[in-house]
Amino acid sequence: MIKLVLVRHGESLWNLENRFTGWTDVDLSENGLKEARRAGKILKKNGFVFDVAYTSVLKRAIRTLWIILYEMDLAWIPVFKSWRLNERHYGALQGLNKAETAKKYGEEQVHKWRRFVNVKPPELTKEDTRYPGNEYKYKDLNEEQIPLTENLADTERRVLEEWRGNIAKDLKEGKRVIISAHGNTLRALVKYLDDIPADNVANLNIPTGIPLVYELDEKLKPITHYYLSDKE
């Protein structure tokens, strides 16, 4: 049996402020730091060990992973960072307060932007200061790879490129893997692993800082999955 652990980053400063974050590189809140430490301690308490780790290129996920591995005395294992594990890009909504956006556009429209698989928020322009192409960390991406906005299907597409190209190979080689990523990238991966129909994804939620364990067969098909909490 193969075990895979998924962790959504601890609460970020913009989670706390109820803002759309996307590719904006905000840090963890104080509570988020506590969530990351707690996740590391829970994993260690339950006997988990990892050979390799994956995360995005956004500091809230990277820092969460660092803290988890530190708490587990595993700071030395290889860590691979990929933009393909970044949060879904929220386009022109990035930085906006979710409640205020709902008042402006209506709760139904915002719900569709956030939760429907094939609905995209309004695009950024390349002249916008929030455009990822302005950031050094994305200098090696071509223009087609840098989103102006995304829906969940777009996010799933790039997440699965990372899954098939690297993560799945490590798992099949017997490596024990942890992924520290984001709400929508993990929703996309869970949708794929559990073969969830697009119509049922709207209510799928991944909480911050709580390890989600998948037990997989040799073909990487889920046998079961469960969250690790303080009570276990």
From Swiss-Prot:
UniProt: substrate binding residues: 8-15, 21-22, 60, 87-90, 98, 114-115, 183-184
EC number: 5.4.2.11
Lineage: Bacteria, Bacillati, Bacillota, Clostridia, Eubacteriales
GO terms (BP aspect): gluconeogenesis; glycolytic process
Example of a GO MF term: phosphoglycerate mutase activity
Family from the record: Belongs to the phosphoglycerate mutase family. BPG-dependent PGAM subfamily.
Name of the protein in question: 2,3-bisphosphoglycerate-dependent phosphoglycerate mutase
Pathway of action: Carbohydrate degradation; glycolysis; pyruvate from D-glyceraldehyde 3-phosphate: step 3/5
UniProt-listed HAMAP family: PGAM_GpmA (MF_01039)
Record key words, sorted: Gluconeogenesis, Glycolysis, Isomerase
Xref: PROSITE patterns: PG_MUTASE
